[in-house]
Amino acid sequence: MEIRIMLFILMMMVMPVSYAACYSELSVQHNLVVQGDFALTQTQMATYEHNFNDSSCVSTNTITPMSPSDIIVGLYNDTIKLNLHFEWTNKNNITLSNNQTSFTSGYSVTVTPAASNAKVNVSAGGGGSVMINGVATLSSASSSTRGSAAVQFLLCLLGGKSWDACVNSYRNALAQNAGVYSFNLTLSYNPITTTCKPDDLLITLDSIPVSQLPATGNKATINSKQGDIILRCKNLLGQQNQTSRKMQVYLSSSDLLTNSNTILKGAEDNGVGFILESNGSPVTLLNITNSSKGYTNLKEVAAKSKLTDTTVSIPITASYYVYDTNKVKSGALEATALINVKYD
C-alpha cells in the first residue's frame, strides 16, 4: 500500500512536464491613420498581420481567435465619433504541433462614422490620436476559460468600467495556464476642415436729397446699391471641391435701431438709417447685445456640397430707410455689420 502511494505521487510530479501548453503574453501594436477626407469617403479599411513567436509552447497547442468587439472611439473631446469594426482574416483555430512556437494571424478593421449619441469606449480627450489596447486577441486557453473570460469582459463594459481596465481583466482571465496574443492599435485622425473666410465689403450709397426721402417707416426707392459678400474657401475635398461640413452665413451688428433687427442706424440719431435686403426680403441681423430674435440665414452650404469655385458669392442690397421724419437732417451716415460664418 505504501509503495502504491509513492508511485501515485511520482506520476503526479512527472505528468505536468509533458502537458501541452503555451504561457506567454505577447502583443503587437499597429498604427492606423484615418484619411483627412474621411468626412467625404465615410469609410476606410485596413488589414494587419503579425507573426507571434511564443518560445514557451511545447508539444501540441491550439490557438483560438477570440470574437472581436466593435469599438466606438471619441476624438477632439468626443465631437468626432468613429465606429471600428474588426474581423479576423482567418477565423479558424491555429494548430501548433511538434513543439512549434510561431504562428501568423491578422485582422481587418473598417472605420465608419458613429452616431452622435453613441457611447464612447475609448476617448482621445481633446486630441486626435489614441492607443486602443486589445482590439483583437487570440488565446490557447480552454473553451470554458475563453467563455468565462468573454462573459467577464462584457459585464465589465456594461458595468461602466474603462476599456483598458476591462481588457486587462480579460487578458488576465485568459492567461491562466494559457498563452494570450493581442493586437493593439493606435488610431490618428487629423480631419480636413473646410473654412470659408469672408472678404471685407464696403457698400457706399450715393447721396440722396432730403426732399426725396420717404415717410417714416419706408425705404427709399432710389440710390439703392448692391454688393456681394465674397467667401474664400479653403480645405475643400476631392477634385469636385466638396465641403467637409455644413456652413451658415449671417450678419450681426451693434448698430441696430432700438427694438429693430433690420434697421441699421449711424452714430447720430438723425432719423435715417439703412436696410439690407437679400433676394428682395429684409435681412434680420443678429443683435450683438441681444441675440434673442435670431437672424436671417443668408446662405447655407451643406456638408459635401460641390463648389464650382473656391469662392462663394452672396448678393445683398443696401437702401436708405427713414425711421423718424421728425429727426431727419442732412449729414453723413455710417453703420457697420459683421459677416459671420457658422460651422456645424
From Swiss-Prot:
InterPro entries the UniProt entry points to: Adhesion_dom_fimbrial, Adhesion_dom_fimbrial_sf, Adhesion_dom_sf, UCP030811
Kindly list the GO CC terms recorded for this protein. Answer: pilus
Q: What does this protein do?
A: Part of the yehABCD fimbrial operon. Could contribute to adhesion to various surfaces in specific environmental niches.
Family stated for the protein in its record = Belongs to the fimbrial protein family.
Span of the signal peptide: 1-20
User: Which keywords does UniProt give here?
Assistant: Signal
Other observations noted: The operon is cryptic under classical laboratory conditions, but is functional when constitutively expressed.
Starting at the broadest rank, the lineage of the source organism is: Bacteria, Pseudomonadati, Pseudomonadota, Gammaproteobacteria, Enterobacterales
Under the heading SUPFAM superfamilies, the entry gives:
Bacterial adhesins
Q: What is this protein called?
A: Uncharacterized fimbrial-like protein YehA
Query: Short name of one Pfam family for this protein?
Result: Fimbrial
Q: Coiled-coil stretches, from where to where?
A: none
Source organism superkingdom: Bacteria
